Amino acid sequence: MYSVTSKDGTKIAYDKIGQGPALILVGGAFSYRKFPQQVELAYLLSEYFTVYNYDRRGRGDSGDTQPYDVSREIEDLQALIDEAGGSAYVWGLSSGAALALRAAEKGVNITKLALHEPPFVVKEEDRKPPKDFTKHTTDLISNNDPAAAIKYFMTKGMGAPSFVVGMMRILPGVWSNLIAVAHTLPYDAALLDGYMEGKKLPTEWKNSVKVPTLVIEGTESPASLRNSAQALANTLPNAQLLSKKGLGHTKKLNTKRISPELTAFFMANH
């Protein structure tokens, strides 16, 4: 394990593997650097890249200086990029894609960007969480009820059936890992900034996010995620859409399908 100090003094923990251009992996809600699929993806990509797999603020071995603000997470990513030599490729998954996108918007030196199924809602008919989703998630954590926060976030935010959450509670190790990062769920909700509730994607992204971008969707994914990926690819000026079976993230990341696609994108014209 390595660590870097973010602008506000928070320690951000990361693992580094491989040799080649720097590539930073940004996990989504409930993810952390020891999440099995994230470890697998880092390993597969390490053949071509120096992969930085980090614990986002509040997770794993990273610190959690309060109060939280989205800009702090952007600074964390900037600190990692500085540690990696001043520029890097970045892959972001789900809410991690939202973080990577917002970092690029703020001018963080990301040379290529892969956005993997950001959970924006872009069509009226798509499933939306309740309008008070962020507030209610935060209230449950503030009231020291992480189990309720997990169930609420998964069922109302991610659209998971209640029985799936129930099954997770009885799987050894799974529930305890979820409880350990539950307090960061309001951070993910804040990162999504209303876009999960149907807020329109800003036209300003055409001018502020010009880096080569790969937007990824799985053809088996829910319609709302596919609509989001397609809308985002159409919004960003230098984006391409990758749409294939097996690239979804709502069940289990198929790292052996995802890694060659990421390698081809990041290594093109290198």
What are these regions (language model features)?
Residues 3-63:
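Conserved HGGG/HGGXW glycine-rich cap/lid loop of the alpha/beta-hydrolase fold
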Residues 35-37, 62-67, 125, 226:
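Conserved catalytic-core motifs of eukaryotic protein kinase domains, centered on the activation segment
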Residues 43, 52-89, 260:
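Active-site loop/oxyanion-hole signature of alpha/beta-hydrolase fold enzymes
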Residues 55-59, 119, 245-248:
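Short beta-to-alpha linker loops that shape the active-site pocket of alpha/beta-hydrolase fold enzymes
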Residues 87-124:
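Conserved hydrolase catalytic core segment
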Residues 118, 122-175, 188-189:
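Helix-rich cap/lid subdomain of alpha/beta-hydrolase
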Residues 177-234, 243:
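Conserved serine/cysteine hydrolase catalytic core
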Residues 238-270:
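Catalytic active-site module of serine/aspartate enzymes centered on a nucleophile-bearing elbow/loop
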